[in-house]
Structures are given as C-alpha cells and as structure tokens.
C-alpha cells in the first residue's frame, strides 16, 4: 500500500518528466528487450530494433497508462481496469514481464533524473510500479 509520502514522491517525480514520458517508456522497453530477449515474443509484429517507431509508440502507451495511474493513486485498480482486462484476457502477458519492465523503467528514470532519484523516491516509485503490476495481473485468475 502506498503511503501518503509515497504518493507525494511519485506525483512530484512524475511531474518532472515533462513531455518525456513516452521517450522514457520506449527507452525502458528497448532496455527490457536487450536485457530479457524472451520478452520479445509478445511483440512478433513489431520492429524491435532500438529506437524503432513501434517500440517508441508502445513506450508512449506505457507512459500514458502510468500517468493515468499517477493521476489516480487512490484508485489505481479502477483507473487501470480496462488495461488489466486486456493484459489478462487478450494479450496474456506473463506477469513476470511487468516486473522486468518496471526494473528497466526505474533504471531509465534514474539515468535521466539522477539528482531527483533519491533513495526515498526510488523506494516510492518501486512500490508504485509494483502496485501497477499487481493491478495488471489481478484478473489473471
């Protein structure tokens, strides 16, 4: 459960991303595909070369969904319900992949915002991404 401090840390940090969320999302996906090649199996129709338009486009979708979650920290399950249905029933993404992408996103954010990525912010973002992953996998049963 995100504490009031976690919520404040996440909102403040996310606000500093400006218009770069999609860029960072694409970079995190590139990082995940390089570090964990088995994750590519969910994207057989994509050009998975680093920086491809399709990866960037999906990165923007990831960032937009996370922004929706940030804007609804008191009801992340409600905010991401449709996305949870999609991943559980249609895409059938292995839940471990959300953890892999979360880690790659944390690395990307730390690289781009080292001064703001304090240990407290890191912990709050990690809890936030774990919450999102839990929501996205909640309908797998």
UniProtKB/Swiss-Prot annotation:
Keyword Transport: yes
Residues modified to Phosphotyrosine: 24
Phosphoserine found at: 3, 102, 124, 138
Entry keywords, A to Z: Acetylation, Heme, Iron, Metal-binding, Oxygen transport, Phosphoprotein, Transport
All copies of domain Globin, residue ranges: 1-141
N6-succinyllysine modification, residue list: 7, 11, 16, 40
Location of Phosphothreonine modifications: 108, 134, 137
GO molecular function, one term: oxygen binding
GO BP terms: hydrogen peroxide catabolic process
Residue numbers binding O2: 58
Positions that bind heme b: 87
Modified residues (N6-acetyllysine): 16
Tissue expression profile of the protein: Red blood cells.
Complex formation: Heterotetramer of two alpha chains and two beta chains.
Function of the molecule: Involved in oxygen transport from the lung to the various peripheral tissues.
Name of the protein described by the UniProt record: Hemoglobin subunit alpha
Originating species: Erinaceus europaeus
Gene that produces this protein: HBA
């Amino acid at each position: 459960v995100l504490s009031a401090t976690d919520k404040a840390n996440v909102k403040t940090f996310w606000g500093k991303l400006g218009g770069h969320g999609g860029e960072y999302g694409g970079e995190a996906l590139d990082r995940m595909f390089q570090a964990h090649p088995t994750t590519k199996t969910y994207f057989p129709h994509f050009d998975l070369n680093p920086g491809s338009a399709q990866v960037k486009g999906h990165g923007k979708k990831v960032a937009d969904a996370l922004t929706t979650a940030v804007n609804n920290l008191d009801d992340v399950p409600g905010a991401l319900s449709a996305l949870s249905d999609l991943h559980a029933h249609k895409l059938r993404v292995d839940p471990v992949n959300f953890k892999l992408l979360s880690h790659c996103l944390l690395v990307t954010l730390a690289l781009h915002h080292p001064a703001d990525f304090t240990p407290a912010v890191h912990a709050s973002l990690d809890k936030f991404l774990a919450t999102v992953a839990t929501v996205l996998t909640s309908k797998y049963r």
